[in-house]
UniProtKB/Swiss-Prot annotation:
It is an enzyme of class 2 (transferase). Belongs to the protein kinase superfamily. Ser/Thr protein kinase family. The chain crosses the membrane at residues 225-245. Residues 51-224 are extracellular. Keywords: ATP-binding, Cell membrane, Glycoprotein, Kinase, Leucine-rich repeat, Membrane, Nucleotide-binding, Phosphoprotein, Receptor, Repeat, Serine/threonine-protein kinase, Signal, Transferase, Transmembrane, Transmembrane helix. One of its GO terms (cellular component) is plasma membrane. SMART domains: S_TKc. This is Probable LRR receptor-like serine/threonine-protein kinase At5g63710. Residues 1-50 form the signal peptide. Residues 246-613 are cytoplasmic.
């Protein structure tokens, strides 16, 4: 990190400038620039601070002997919570680590104990050896510990008796010997089978929570009598249940489906025709969440490509923040949202999986991926989006949002609409995806206040400043998406600083319009297009991205304007007049100095978010 000659950090004057000026400017462009600057300062400053948990994970990786380089963790990190695979975080603390069935052959480093907030540690089905770390007893937050099917040797350290919060302990199929702390036999789920640990008949304690101790001969007769009586009672109960079931079946509707998967979450969940998958089915479909199947990452978790036994391709969304207070709520919210939102331009949920440590959603796999991919990330030989398809995306997305806002009860706010969240089916029809950031609000409310979540460049200014989102927040994001469709560019692009001061696509478009350079707005990859249709979509986009939410149209109005029946000409004339006034006012305001050196602003543009990174 660069420093000035007097030892002052590069960020100090910039941070001071922001704090003195940004929050007293009532101007959309300057507000967005300030938030961008704050994001930049926060991200780059954090790289200078040591990350204890990140260092501990790197030590763990080294001790595991990751010869196949499965753990692509790097020392050039901000935090392991941002992008490291197999790591689950709550806030900025690691709470779960799942490294099962990974082919590791090393040892378990005591550095693992630096993960003070770890709740779940899964290392089963590897070839790890050596002694169990004594210091693991200090990890008092551990609830799930699975070290089964390895080659650990020695005894269970006495310090492990301090693990008072354990609910699931599996040390089976190891070379362990010696005694077992007495309190471990009171854990809800435990397994010491396949070891030489003292349990079973010799200790009169079971070796696993699912097994029973052998009964003595003095109790055999009583057991036989009890067993006979139980069988008779069971037969009577079974016959009674059959009668009740037949009577109930006549009355119930065919859509009332309950799910209860043994070994998973015991709660019964009814969600219509959704399929409940077992965790094993999901693991088989995704090759145990193999990183080679990773196709995306959002605010609530990673998305993997999967293949079901019937050869159906699916997209599996593994929620990353289940352990946080919002994790369970996020899962239930998404299930509820999809169950009430059914539209041809909305992504259909086909199933889910829930266990004590996992929340997973299963969607159809979209062969043509996302609009963002088709605009900017094509591989050699792949086909881009022609103008008719882009126009179809604009119309379909508008219809999908209109349905969420005006035809769902309660209404639904997406809150992260962008080209990357618009998927394309086999016929290149658009469907809105990623309802992990959606928010249900009561129809009697005009907005909902929550933490700011979304992608910088697509977030409406009032949402940035107040945290209040409404339908008009989505309208703003839709307008930016229209500009992405026309230009093929990102909502934020630092490379523009080489020629102008506008890093935001919205400001760049306004600049070109002032200079009457409409042709320069259109994506250079478009060889043919209708200039009148381009003009219409740009005008609608700018009406949708006005600074005041009250000035933005509702999505039903947007649909009408796109269809040519919404009075676009009159609204555009009014916008031009207001824009002229806004430009004059902007000239009287100070501007943010462009003091960022290109080499010091290497920030991943698609990853600049105001939500907690996962």
């Amino acid at each position: 990190m660069a420093h000035s000659g007097n030892g002052e950090s590069f960020h100090d004057p910039l941070r001071g400038f922001i704090q003195r000026n940004c929050f007293r400017w009532n101007n959309q462009k300057l507000i967005l620039q300030c938030f961008m600057a704050l994001a930049f300062v926060g991200i780059t400053s954090s790289t200078t601070q040591p990350d204890i948990e990140g260092g501990a994970l790197l030590q763990l990786r080294d001790s595991l002997n990751d010869s196949s380089n499965r753990l692509k963790w790097t020392r050039d990190f901000v935090s392991p919570c941002y992008s490291w695979s197999y790591v689950t975080c709550r806030g900025q603390s690691v709470v779960a680590l799942n490294l099962a069935s990974s082919g590791f052959t090393g040892t378990l480093s005591p550095a693992i104990t630096k993960l003070k907030f770890l709740v779940t540690l899964e290392l089963q089905n590897n070839s790890l050896s050596g002694a169990l770390p004594d210091s693991l007893g200090n990890m008092v937050n551990l609830q799930t510990l699975n070290l089964s099917v390895n080659s650990f040797s020695g005894s269970i350290p006495a310090s492990w008796s301090q693990l008072s919060n354990l609910k699931h302990l599996d040390l089976s199929s190891n070379n362990l010997t010696g005694s077992i702390p007495t309190q471990f036999f009171s854990i809800p789920t435990f397994d010491f089978s396949g070891t030489q640990l003292i349990c079973g008949k010799s200790l009169n304690q079971p070796c696993s929570s699912s097994s029973r101790l052998p009964v003595t001969s003095s109790k055999k007769k009583l057991r036989d009598i009890t067993l006979t009586a139980s069988c008779v009672a069971s037969i009577i109960l079974f016959l009674g249940a059959m009668v009740m079931y037949h009577h109930h079946r006549v009355r119930r509707t065919k859509y009332d489906i309950f799910f209860d998967v043994a070994g998973e979450d015991d709660r019964k969940i009814s969600f219509g025709q959704l399929k409940r998958f077992s965790l094993r089915e999901i693991q088989l479909a995704t090759d145990s969440f193999n990183e080679s199947n990773l196709i995306g990452q959002g605010g609530f978790g990673k998305v993997y490509r999967g293949l079901l036994p019937d050869k159906t391709k699916v997209a599996v969304k593994r929620l990353a923040d289940y352990f946080s207070p919002g994790g369970e709520a996020a899962f239930q919210r998404e299930i509820q949202l999809i169950s009430v939102a059914v539209h041809k331009n909305l992504l259909r949920l086909i199933g889910f999986c829930t266990t004590s440590s996992e929340r997973i959603l299963v969607y159809p796999y979209m062969e043509n991926l996302s609009v963002a991919y088709r605009l900017r990330d094509l591989k050699a030989g792949e086909e881009g989006l022609d103008w008719p398809t882009r126009k179809r995306v604009a119309f379909g997305s508008a219809h999908g949002l209109e349905y969420l806002h005006e035809h769902c009860n309660p209404k639904i706010i997406h809150r992260d609409l962008k080209a990357a969240n618009i998927l394309l089916d086999n016929n290149f029809e658009p469907v809105l995806g990623d309802f992990g950031l959606a928010k249900l609000v009561d129809t009697s409310l005009t907005h909902v206040t929550t933490q700011v979540r979304g992608t910088m460049g697509h977030i409406a200014p009032e949402y940035l400043c107040t945290g209040k989102s409404s339908e008009k927040t989505d309208v703003f994001g839709y307008g930016i998406t229209l500009l992405e469709l026309v230009t093929g560019q990102r909502a934020i692009d630092f490379s523009r600083l080489e020629e102008e001061e506008n890093i935001l696509l919205l400001d760049h478009i306004k600049k070109l319009l002032r200079e009457q350079r409409l042709r320069d707005i259109v994506d250079s990859n478009l060889t043919t297009y209708d200039s009148k249709e381009v003009e219409t979509i740009v005008q609608v986009a700018l009406l949708c991205t006005q600074g005041s939410p009250e000035d933005r149209p509702a999505m039903s109005e947007v649909v009408k304007m796109l269809q040519g029946t919404g009075g676009l000409a009159e609204k555009w004339t009014e916008w031009e007049q207001l824009e002229e006034v806004r430009n004059k006012e902007a000239l009287l305001l100070p501007t943010l100095p462009a003091t960022w050196d290109e080499e010091e602003t290497t920030v991943d543009q698609e990853s600049i978010r105001l939500s907690t990174a996962r």
